[in-house]
């Protein structure tokens, strides 16, 4: 996970080697393969962006912005469009500096997502990052459904030198969070990180469990800054969008951790997510 706040595009580039190469290679072929900026040029460009999983909506917005700038600046040569295109993509992916306020406030960060996306690893890395910034961190191991989830998280907590509160396998996750919230308040913790079960979006009872956790935090820790991060696997492409949509119906999602960015040639999903939902990708995992 990239931890430095260098602006989303810079962090994205670090985690997107394969994707960037493929998309840029495709874009370069358009710029070198056309001698005029016409409908065919824009069509080819759209196709390459969509193939890179940037998605139809984001691609349309990017290309429309490019057309507008080409007209305003009276550009005739396709080669002169490249930087404009990069700027147009950047505009779709801006993350405001206030998006990271939760790192500085007394906060509760709930981390959600389906199984297998790298959720527990993300919690562990985030705990280590915050600890390195001299924040007092506590982890709540509320994934009590999956065998060994607690052990895996305990290993990450130990590595980060951060205390953890967890329940036995099968314990009520909301009660684990209740205990963790009270411990956080008693110990003067800066950041409480809550790891949740891999809530498969077709399991209604698991979604209800998430709502219960939400209510416990709201009731017991009302003055804490709330941050709900969803972990999405970039290799699942457009399927990540449907996962986000399902979880959005259950809780307010404030940011995204996008994992496995080097395992896919279609990391353009990062652009699609932000353009479609306006939810910033705050961390990149590889």
Q: What are the residue ranges of the model-derived segments?
A:
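Non-catalytic terminal/linker segments enriched in charged/polar, low-complexity residues
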Residues: 1-98, 104-111, 128, 132, ...
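P-loop/Walker A NTP-binding module and the surrounding RecA-like catalytic core of P-loop NTPases
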Residues: 90-286
